[in-house]
Amino acid sequence: MAKKVTGYLKLQVPAGAANPSPPIGPALGQRGLNIMEFCKNFNAQTQKEEKNTPIPVVITIYADRSFTFEMKTPPMSFFLKQAAKIQSGSKLPGRDVAGKVSSAQVREIAERKMKDLNCDSIESAMRMVEGSARSMGLQVEG
């Protein structure tokens, strides 16, 4: 028989930098979960990732206070900022251009994000990436 799920918790944790300090400690602690177990497992699974890459995590909490977690790919905005070599997007998207990304970079980002996106083809994933780029004030070339 399957364990009874009591809830889900969504966090964005830097790769290899999970520790019991806020925001992770309080979020897990108030639900009665073992904080150090999560931190050790998460850091072990993200050691191949570049340090401080934000990794979205969905933690499934069970009635017996055990948990499992599923890691997603980093946010699209993180990849777009890396590709454009900028710190943040435009304050006025549509008016100010914060940077430029090529269609090859858009395709690469779409291929990396494909498993987390709700689309069937790489072309539709590319359109989603282009839309995110435009909403950040990035110009898509090509």
Swiss-Prot record:
Naming one, the record's GO cellular component terms include: cytosolic large ribosomal subunit
What is the recorded post-translational modification? Answer: One or more lysine residues are methylated.
Q: Name one Pfam family in it.
A: Ribosomal_L11
Q: Which GO terms describe its biological process?
A: translation
GO molecular function per UniProt = large ribosomal subunit rRNA binding; structural constituent of ribosome
InterPro entries, alphabetically? Ribosomal_uL11, Ribosomal_uL11_bac-typ, Ribosomal_uL11_C, Ribosomal_uL11_C_sf, Ribosomal_uL11_CS, Ribosomal_uL11_N, Ribosomal_uL11_N_sf
| Its biological purpose | Forms part of the ribosomal stalk which helps the ribosome interact with GTP-bound translation factors.
Q: Would you identify the family this protein belongs to, as annotated?
A: Belongs to the universal ribosomal protein uL11 family.
Subunit structure and binding partners: Part of the ribosomal stalk of the 50S ribosomal subunit. Interacts with L10 and the large rRNA to form the base of the stalk. L10 forms an elongated spine to which L12 dimers bind in a sequential fashion forming a multimeric L10(L12)X complex.
**What protein does this entry describe?**
Large ribosomal subunit protein uL11
Species, as recorded:
Rhodopseudomonas palustris (strain BisA53)
Which gene specifies this protein's sequence? Answer: rplK
